[in-house]
Amino acid sequence: MDPEETSVYLDYYYATSPNPDIRETHSHVPYTSVFLPVFYTAVFLTGVLGNLVLMGALHFKPGSRRLIDIFIINLAASDFIFLVTLPLWVDKEASLGLWRTGSFLCKGSSYMISVNMHCSVFLLTCMSVDRYLAIVCPVVSRKFRRTDCAYVVCASIWFISCLLGLPTLLSRELTLIDDKPYCAEKKATPLKLIWSLVALIFTFFVPLLSIVTCYCCIARKLCAHYQQSGKHNKKLKKSIKIIFIVVAAFLVSWLPFNTSKLLAIVSGLQQERYFPSAILQLGMEVSGPLAFANSCVNPFIYYIFDSYIRRAIVHCLCPCLKNYDFGSSTETSDSHLTKALSTFIHAEDFTRRRKRSVSL
């Protein structure tokens, strides 16, 4: 195949490489053939083990299941499916970019990566909305925050994510450049670039705006609650800390890569490119591994900051510690906050009604 008809897949993640001149078979980052295989192997081992333990602990935990646990299990399943493809990328990096595992795995692994990316973003958005409803609207949200609704939402997310990943199967192919096999993206057409831009906006930046908005509203509500109740020291700090850690992990993992992807698409749509191809490729190479690493960090975040999940994991691995007290001061289930805020909102409504009756 003519090299001009393809662009080598150098961005490490499901994305269109819009510039046909990005075809270098070497990396702009030194020692990637040594560092990335080691890094991806570590991500694979820790991520597979961590997500398996997390899913098993929450699935087999006796007693009632929290609503947010349904989203966490699905998020862990999405990450686990992606992590299964990492050995293929380890081999790719170790062989200096060559794809030696055939056309089927070239298309299949790219499709699984695409599904994971969309599924993760949508699940994180739903988790943010769930926290918003639980903390900001605890009374009104009772009719929506049900187990059956959560299962329907998760099933819908998987279905939509699988559909959004289908273009990958059509655009990915195993191609030969200088008689060497590469898992490549076909040359981008203007229509394909426009689709990529629209998809990126609605599958990342809009969910990102929703996540940030939800957590800003949560933070404001928590501040108002603790100021009214007079308890705004440790509880407030821990609640806000958990919120910002979740948001920060999401931003650090996804924002650099998708920003580089956005710049690459915009550059491909312009007649005169304002962003050099080498800079765009370097941005993809540096930010891609961060997006990969996101799939292994979530179990550790939940273990450290959610005592409910920490208790479930320890009980799953060491049943003998069943009666051990793990504390609940940093639990992210928001149950104690929901009850407190419900009382707080009822008190506010009662005060407003009383003032209105007095004024009349």
Curated annotation (Swiss-Prot):
Keyword set, alphabetical order: Cell membrane, G-protein coupled receptor, Membrane, Phosphoprotein, Receptor, Transducer, Transmembrane, Transmembrane helix
Cytoplasmic side of membrane: 55-69, 142-149, 214-239, 306-360
Post-translational modification: Phosphorylation is necessary for YWHAE binding and efficient surface expression. O-glycosylated. Sialylated O-glycans in the N-terminal tail inhibits binding of GPR15LG.
Gene Ontology MF, one: C-C chemokine binding
This protein's record includes keyword Cell membrane: yes
Ranges that cross the membrane: 34-54, 70-90, 121-141, 150-170, 193-213, 240-260, 285-305
Entry GO CC: external side of plasma membrane; plasma membrane
Sites of Phosphoserine modification: 359
SUPFAM superfamilies given in the database record: Family A G protein-coupled receptor-like
A GO BP entry: positive regulation of cytosolic calcium ion concentration
Domain of life: Eukaryota
Extracellular topological domain residue ranges: 1-33, 91-120, 171-192, 261-284
Principal subcellular localisation of the protein: membrane
Membrane topology (UniProt): Multi-pass membrane protein
Subcellular location: Cell membrane
Keyword Membrane appears in the UniProt entry: yes
InterPro entries xref list: CCR1-9-like, GPCR_Rhodpsn, GPCR_Rhodpsn_7TM
Function: G protein-coupled receptor that plays an important role in immune homeostasis. Acts via its natural ligand GPR15LG, a chemokine-like polypeptide strongly expressed in gastrointestinal tissues. GPR15-GPR15LG signaling axis regulates intestinal homeostasis and inflammation through the migration of immune cells. Controls thereby the specific homing of T-cells, particularly FOXP3+ regulatory T-cells (Tregs), to the large intestine lamina propria. Also required for skin localization of thymus-derived dendritic epidermal T-cells.
Quaternary structure annotation from Swiss-Prot or TrEMBL: Interacts with adapter YWHAE; this interaction promotes ER-to-Golgi transport of GPR15.
Family, as annotated: Belongs to the G-protein coupled receptor 1 family.
Protein name: G-protein coupled receptor 15
Organism of derivation: Macaca nemestrina (Pig-tailed macaque)
